[in-house]
Amino acid sequence: MSQKEIWYETLHANFGQYFSVDRVLYHEKTDHQDLIIFENDALGRVMALDGVVQTTERDEFIYHEMLTHVPLLSHGNAKRVLIIGGGDGGMLREVSRHHGVEQITMVEIDAGVVEFCRQYLPNHSAGSYDDPRFNLVIDDGVNFVRQCSEKFDVIISDCTDPIGPGESLFTSDFYQGCARSLNEGGIFVAQNGVCFLQQDEAIGSHKKLSHYFNDVSFYQAAIPTYYGGIMTFAWASNNPALRQMDIVTLRQHFAQSGITCRYYTPDVHIGSFALPQYLLSALQNAQ
């Protein structure tokens, strides 16, 4: 039996994780980054950009459900949704399950990610690219929100880590543009790394977002693929009541949506905003 090739993630300098490669499906440099999609016996198909794992078939549902359904069900009546990034299609799939949403705009800087994820990760998008409500824009997210005259009810930043093409999606310019692009009562959420190992991301996002939103916080989910396990998501709005919604109302919104999830529940939603003391202390000390 031949030894399998090993792929090593390069996100952290002093520790990390590896994946055995059963078959490489695609590996090329796009116009913006190095893209590889390969098969792994335990996790299914894996996609990485510039040496950092972005998604796996095995547990992508956790990430996409939590970054979609928490803001949309908190809002309760979102008609227009903007996705920044999201080229693998998973976020689009989950947003499109909300039948009350009338327009979905996705802004992805790298057309290659969209093209090859549609080909090699079809279960992520699950046909949602053909949804008539969907509009794809190939552009830099900062540039889009800076120039956009449209308004949205929910903005989801499905960004990579703050290196390479994703770095601009952690800047004050981007957050200011998102705040300006939200309707009254709108909600902004964003991927914010594994806080235990990438605490500076949360601290930086909190400081910057607080300049443009009245209510800024974080929520979390356990996602095995991301080294360190507990992924943190930024939350920003101008109405604290949206974040503090009671369980009865959330259950009503969830039941009315008709959506069935594998990870998200209204109870998980409520619990996800209970943050560990080390994060609360770090945010307080940084003020």
UniProtKB/Swiss-Prot annotation:
It is found in: Cytoplasm. The active site is at 158 (proton acceptor). HAMAP family: Spermidine_synth. Pathway: Amine and polyamine biosynthesis; spermidine biosynthesis; spermidine from putrescine: step 1/1. Belongs to the spermidine/spermine synthase family. The keyword Cytoplasm applies. GO terms for molecular function: spermidine synthase activity. The keyword Lipid metabolism does not apply. Pfam families: Spermine_synt_N, Spermine_synth. This is Polyamine aminopropyltransferase. Residues 5-238 form the PABS domain. It comes from the Bacteria. The lineage of its organism: Bacteria, Pseudomonadati, Pseudomonadota, Gammaproteobacteria, Enterobacterales. Keywords: Cytoplasm, Polyamine biosynthesis, Spermidine biosynthesis, Transferase. One of its GO terms (cellular component) is cytosol. Spermidine binds at residues 64, 88, 158-161. Homodimer or homotetramer. Disulfide bonds: none annotated.
